[in-house]
Every structure is written in C-alpha cells, then in structure tokens.
Regions:
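Catalytic domains of carbohydrate-active enzymes, especially glycoside hydrolases
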Residues: 76-95
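Residue-level detector of functionally special positions within alpha-helical transmembrane segments
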Residues: 19, 88, 115-116
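Short, glycine/charge-rich beta-strand/loop segments that flank catalytic centers
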Residues: 93-109, 211-215
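Active-site loop segments of alpha/beta catalytic cores
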Residues: 6-58, 62-69, 151, 155-432
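Outer-membrane beta-barrel proteins
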Residues: 69-76
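A contiguous, low-structure linker/loop signature
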Residues: 100-171
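Short, charge-rich binding segments
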Residues: 82-86, 118, 127-128, 197-202
C-alpha cells in the first residue's frame, strides 16, 4: 500500500505534468510559460523522418517495432503517445484521413525502404519502379494511372513529378484548379469528431490540419493525390502565373476561400473549441536570400484571401491560425500579421534578414514564432553536439522571452542528421 504522503506527491507531480496545454495557451497569448513549449511531429512541417523516429524509440528504450509513415511524401514517422511522453512534447497534431497521395492512412502493411528500414505504410500504398530502380507512387494507389511522385533509389523522400499538360488559355477554367478543394462530407466530419474526442483527456495542445485552406501552397499545386490533375500544376508555371495570369489566380483564390470557410464552419460545428490551432497554409514566400514576390504583390494577390479566412476564424472560434513560409520573409512579416496570422513557422534563422533578435524585437509581441530552435541547414546538420546545445539554448533565450514561442527545428528533422545532434538538442531542452 502506498503511504498517503507519497501518494499525494505522485498525484501532485502527475498534475504538474499535465500542464502542457495550459503552458501552450500562455505562450501563444504572449505570456511567459513555465517552461519552453515543445512540438515534434504535430504538423507536416514540424515532423521527424521515419528513420530518426526509429532511432528515438530505441534511444528511449521503447518497444522495437516498425514505425508508421503518416506522411509518405516526406516519409515522416508517427510520433505516438509513447514518444510524446518520453520527449515531453506539448502539442499533438490531427490531420485528415488521407495522406498527400490521396491514400487513406489505414490497413498498415510492412515495407522495406531503400535504406533498409522496415516501416509501416498504408495498405493501398501501391508503387512501381522505373528502369533506374527509383520508386514511383501513384495517386490513390492506382497503378493504372501515371505516377505523381518519385523517390530516387538513393533518396529518403518523394519529389513530385511534373504532370503539367499544355495550357490553352482560351479554355483554361478556374474549376480545373479546384478539384482538390471539395466540400467536406458527413464521413469527413464524423472522422474529425471521433479523432478529437480520442485525445480530449490527454491535456495536450492540439493543432488541426484539415486541409483545403492552402491558397497556392507550392507543395500542393502539383496535386500528387489526383489521378489526372487539370489546370496549372507545374511549380514554375504556377509562380509565373501569379504575374502573367493574376486575374485567374485571384479568381481561384476567391473560390478556394469561399469553400474553405464553408468547410471550417462545418468543422467547427462538430469539434467546437476542442482544438487550439488550425494549420492554414504552407505556401513558401521566401528563398534563402529574398522573397518570391514583393510586399505589393503579396498585398494584392494573397492578403485579402488569407484575411478573409483568418477573420472568420477569429470572429467565430477561439482557434489560433498557423502560417508556414520558409526563407527570407522578414519584409513580409507585417503583412502576415495584417492578414491575421497568429503563428509563423519555421522561422528560418539562416536566411537573409531572419536574425532571431531582430524578429523578436520587431514582431515578437504580435506573432508567435513556432520553430527556429535549431538550424537544420547548418549547426544541427553539420555541427558538433556541443554547438547544437549552445544554439538551442541561445535560440530559446531569445525567442521564449515573454512567451510567443513554440520550440521546433527549422522545418522537419531529416533522415541524415547526426543522431548525436538530435540527442544534444533534446538534452538542451531538458536543461532549460
């Protein structure tokens, strides 16, 4: 029998550990959290490659078994509740039933990767191989249609294949670029209701990624989940079209925005405020040294539509809104804020103008920085464990002051990062 005093201490410690969501709500309200809030794996842009997930399970002494690949496009591994607890993760992510290839994440079956790891992939994950031995994946797992993405035999994730058909502007229709922006069904709503109810008792913050709000996310433009995508689907063609076919692009965004708000209304009707954040868009506006467009172009082509979605969310829910954009986007930060985004990710600290001290000083009381904790293109990938620890602590000191910060690396943790650097990062977080 456990003595009452010890039992009380256990209960008290357990209660204190259940403060993830409360701590999260502090930091996104720009109040100083009790500790740094941590996310690994809650979104498709804050995830961990399946190879590293397997190493983490081994590091923490968890059951040895194949890891589920919850997003095959980037080969992101599932961060299950065992790892959430082991890594002191504060945020849980929810995504739709289908992955980016239009394949339901269910009926998991074992596959062996090019690098020799046994993983679990959805049952309808049907692939073929080209003459070089590269892996080809087909939309919805249908091998009777052309493949939509390829993983080189020396690679660790998929790249979209260019399926752009010749464009005749005289017959180009807005509907051609709306095929993937369908209204949610009762099946979809029941799925979301069930998933949200499953995690209500976990005392974790929740970010939902329902899809359908992307507005030009270049990762989604090729539509790797559609069997025969129509319209403008080439990456280069899309970027050019924002200038040469501006009226067409704006009409696409206008229609997408109306569909998105209709879907968000229906989603809110079944899950209410049981989530904390909604992932809106992953459209990248930055390169390593500059932006893809001027502030004037952003204000004209994107801002009105983002603002319409964000305004509906803020006027009708308690959700915060999440915007991902890689690159040197400091010159667009005020416009992201004007558009109503509450959160910016991944905070690419090695890009031009993205000095964390500057960002925190100029924008830290108006937008939450979700990321920027370790430079995945620099120290995290190529430095020593000591350098990684030093960088993590420095970034947290800067970005976590007065809240407004959720720790994550600059984008996903890749397969070939030295694992000792992953351990160093986790160790630094423990020492804060």
């Amino acid at each position: 029998m456990i003595p009452k005093k010890i039992n009380f201490m256990i209960q008290k410690q357990s209660y204190m550990k259940e403060s993830s969501r409360q701590n999260f709500l502090k930091t996104i309200s720009h109040r100083q959290p009790d500790r740094v809030v941590v996310d690994f794996g809650a979104t498709p842009v804050t995830g961990i490659h399946v190879l590293v997930v397997e190493k983490l399970r081994e590091y923490y002494g968890l059951e040895k078994r194949p890891v589920k690949v919850i997003e095959p496009y980037q080969m992101l591994g599932e961060i299950d509740m065992e790892l959430v607890d082991a890594m002191d993760i504060d945020v849980i992510g929810l995504s739709g039933e289908n992955n980016m290839f239009g394949i339901p994440n269910k009926d998991w079956t074992a596959h062996r990767t090019f690098w020799g790891q046994e993983v679990l992939l959805p049952g309808n994950f049907n692939c073929t191989y080209n003459s070089n031995g590269d892996m080809l994946i087909h939309p919805e797992g249908d091998t009777t249609v052309p493949p939509s993405a390829m993983m080189p035999k020396s690679g660790y994730f998929f790249d979209a294949l260019d399926r752009q058909q010749p464009i005749d502007d005289s017959v180009l229709k807005v509907e051609d670029n709306l095929e993937e922006f369908a209204l949610v069904t009762e099946h979809d709503l029941n799925y979301w209701k069930t998933r949200v109810e499953e995690i209500q008792s976990l005392s974790k913050a929740v970010i939902a990624n329902p899809g359908g709000t992307a507005l030009g996310d270049i990762a989604l433009v090729p539509a790797v989940g559609l069997k025969h995508p129509r319209g403008i689907r080439g990456v280069e063609e899309w970027y050019i079209s924002t200038l040469t076919r501006e009226d067409f692009i704006k009409e696409v965004y206008d229609r997408e925005t109306d569909i998105a708000i209709d879907n968000l209304k229906k989603l809110y009707s079944v899950i209410g405020n049981k989530i904390d954040v909604v992932y809106i868009c992953g459209a990248d506006f930055g390169t390593q040294n500059s932006t893809f467009c001027s502030p004037e172009t952003f204000s004209r082509v994107w801002l009105p539509y983002y603002k319409k979605v964000n305004d509906w969310i803020h006027q009708n829910t308690q959700w915060k809104t999440f915007k991902h954009s890689c690159g040197a986007v400091e010159t667009l930060m005020d416009l992201f804020i004007e558009a109503g985004f509450d959160i910016i990710n991944p905070v690419q600290i090695n890009a031009a103008g993205m000095d964390p001290q500057l960002l925190k000083k100029k924008y830290g009381d108006r937008i939450v920085f979700w990321g920027g904790g370790a430079d995945t293109q620099g120290v995290f990938a190529f430095g020593t464990p000591e350098q990684v620890k030093e960088q993590v602590k420095r970034q947290c000191d800067i970005l976590n002051k007065n809240g407004g910060f959720v720790f994550n690396t600059v984008h996903n943790i890749q397969a070939n990062v030295p694992f000792e650097n992953v351990v160093a990062m986790l160790g630094a977080l423990k020492e804060l």
